[in-house]
């Protein structure tokens, strides 16, 4: 799919991964819809200022994506403004960390479960449910569900310090949604999942949780990753653009971008003397 003049809805665009994706789409000539939440006022203000500087036809909309009525109105505004929707980057999540929040049954933590499930899972469903009819009527489309390896590894290994139970379960469900939506959206809309590991903008230096880990704990996460480091933001942007522009014959699939974390950091052992290595 060519990006120029296409309409793109990017969730989580006020900061981090979503902002980088939205900015690059705008630079490529897309008309970008930017939903934002009142929880992030400074980031949302900066986002709107930067996109105003790009020129072009972009739309920033305040919305709580966990609210069915507000999501329906969001898509209505997209249809009224642009008449089409071609690209949906379903990038919204809230994940608690055991090392930060502790158990769900702590008094200060009673709402954490609902926050993780409603934001990571319910909001994604609400947006696709409301956006898909418009996308199917827009000649061609692509949906990218951004998820986490938490759904694959759960609380195992060093990731057990980072991923809460509810967050991990919600991400496992996203893979099921991806397959279901791929069937519902075919043949005009492709639906794929981008499953992310540890990145400089996620659970790495300067982000919540990472500073609470000891040096040995940080080292164990990197050692558990075959490439022995967190990924970079531009790695994610490149993967998203591959799924939009080049993955013409790909739908219902999961593209895992984790530096080999899921494989456990275990390399092929050196064979004993006298046995040829491959």
Predicted regions and their residues:
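C-terminal substrate-recognition "lid" of short-chain dehydrogenase/reductases
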Residues: 2, 229-257, 262
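Active-site loop of short-chain dehydrogenase/reductase
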Residues: 6, 55-57, 84-85, 135-149, ...
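Conserved glycine-rich cofactor-binding loop
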Residues: 7, 14-15
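Conserved glycine-rich Rossmann-like NAD(P)H-binding loop of the short-chain dehydrogenase/reductase
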Residues: 28-46
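The beta1-alpha1 cofactor-binding region of Rossmann-like NAD(H)/NADP(H)-dependent oxidoreductases
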Residues: 41, 62-74, 110, 235
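A glycine/serine/threonine-rich, flexible loop-to-helix segment
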Residues: 44-46, 102-103, 158, 198-224, ...
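Catalytic loop of short-chain dehydrogenase/reductase
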Residues: 94-97, 106-112, 136, 142-173, ...
